[in-house]
Amino acid sequence: ILYYPILVVVLTAAGLYFTCRTGLVQFRMFWESIRLVMEKPQNEGAVSPFHALMVSTASRVGTGNILGVSTAICLGGPGSVFWMWVIAVIGGASAFIESTLAQVYKRRDSKGDSYGGPAYYIESAMHNRTLGVLFAFFLIITYAGGFNMLASYNLQSTFAAYSWYDPAVTPWIIGAILGALVGYCIMGGGRRILRVTGVLVPIMGLIYVAAAVIVVVMHINLIPQVFGMIFADAFDFRSILGGVSGSCLMFGVKRGLFSNEAGVGSAPNAAASADVSHPVKQGLVQMLSVFIDTLLICTATAMMCLASGTPITKEIAGAGYVQNAVTVAFGSFGPILITVCMVLFAFSTLIGNFFYVDNCLIFIHKKEPGKSFMTGFRILASLVIFVGAGMSMAAAWDIADILMAFMCLINIPACLVLGGTAVKVMKDYERQKREGRDPVFHAADVGLDLDEVEYWK
C-alpha cells in the first residue's frame, strides 16, 4: 500500500505537476544545465557546482544502478526499464524544484560555507521545525542505516561468483574491510568527502559505461529486439493490473526512485553547499544528476544485460544476472570487472551518503555536534555497514525501500507547498538571462521575506 498506490501516485502526480508548472524545465534548460556544471564558485576555496553535483551523483550512482536494475528486470520483467525512464524524465522537474528551494533557504556557517536541505526549507519557509526534524530523522536512519546496509550487502554479493566465497565468513570479512575504509574517509568530514567523490565518481562512471558500450556493440544486431522487449512488457497492462506488487510498473518505480532519488529530498543537501550566484544554477545542475543516473548509467546496465542474451530468471536476480551478462562478452574477466565497478560504486555511495547525514545532524542539534559525538556516530555508522554485509537480499532492499518512502512522503508535499517560490526564482533567472546578464539572486526581487532567507540577505 505504501508504494502502490500511495507513492506511485504521489511521485507521478508531483513530477507531472512540476513539469507543467516549470514549463518543461528539464527539456528547455537541459543544455544550460550542462553549461553550468563547470562554472567556478563565487569565492575561492568554496564548493563548486561540479563538486556538489559529484556528491549527489556519488550517492545516486551506486549499487542500485547495477544490481537494482538487474533485480528489477529479473523480478519485474524488461518493462521495468521503461518505467524507470518515465520516473527519471518527470523526476527531473522534481529534482530541480527541491534543489532550487535548498539553495534559496540555505544558511551560512561560521566558516562562510553554505548548508541546507529539505529540513531547512521546511523550517524556514513553512515555519514547522517539528516536521523538519522528522524529515532529518528519517534521512539519517535511511542513509546511515538502510541505504548503507544495502550498499554493503550488494557489494559483498558480487563476490559470490568466486570459488573461494564462503557465505558464512566472506560477507563479514568484506563488511569489516568496507566499514573500516569508509570510517577513515568520513572521519575527515565534509571536505574529505567532497575530495574523494570528486575523484571517484567520474572514474567509476567512465569505466562502467565503457564496459556496457562494448557489450552492446558486440550485440548491436539485438538492440531493436531489446527495445521491443522493453516496450512490449512495459505496456502489458493485463500483467500489470493482474499483480501490481510484482509488475514491471512497481519494480520500475521502486528501483527508479531508489536509483535517481528525485523528490526523495537527499540531493538538496548537497545542492545547498554549492557557492553559486543564483539558486537556479544549482537546481539545473542537480537536475542533470537524475539524467546521468537513470538515463545513462541505469540504461547502460539494462542494455548490457538484455543484449547479452542471458536468460532472465528470478534465481539470478541481482549480481548473478549482471555477471552472467558481462561473462558473455569478457569471459572470465567479466565478473572481475563487475566486482571492481561495484567496489567503486558502493564506496562512493557510502561516503556520499554521510554528507547528507552530517547535514541533518547539524539541523537537529541546531549547530555542529561535538567532536566526540560525531566520532561515536561515525563508528556506529561503520558498524552498520559491517552488519549490512551479512543481511539477506530481501531484507536489505525492503528496509531501504520503506525508509526512503517515508522521506519522499514528507519532502514531496513540502515541495508542492513551496513550489511557487522555486518557479518565481526560475523566472527571475530567465529574465536576467534574456537581458544578457549572468544571473545574480536578490531575494527581494521575487518578494521573499528576508528573515526566511538567511544566506541571501
Predicted regions span which residues?
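Alpha-helical membrane segments and immediately flanking helix-loop junctions
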Residues: N43-L75, L101-A119, E123-A125, I140, ...
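Membrane-interface loop-to-helix entry segments
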Residues: V10-Y17, R21-I34, N154-F159, T170-M218, ...
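Extracellular/periplasmic helix-exit of transmembrane alpha-helices
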Residues: T19, I97-K106, A211-M229, F237, ...
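Transmembrane helix-loop junctions in multi-pass membrane proteins
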Residues: R21-Q26, N65-V69, P78, G145-Q156, ...
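Helix-loop-helix module between adjacent transmembrane segments
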Residues: A14-T19, I87-G112, P118-Y153, S157-C185, ...
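Extracellular loop-to-transmembrane helix junctions
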Residues: L2-E32, C74-G112, I292-A300, I402-I412
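Selective recognition of specific alpha-helical transmembrane segments in multi-pass small-molecule
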Residues: I90-E98, A176-G190, V201-N221, K254-L257, ...
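N-terminal alpha-helical transmembrane segments of multi-pass membrane transport
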Residues: I1-T63, I73-S80, G91, L416-K457
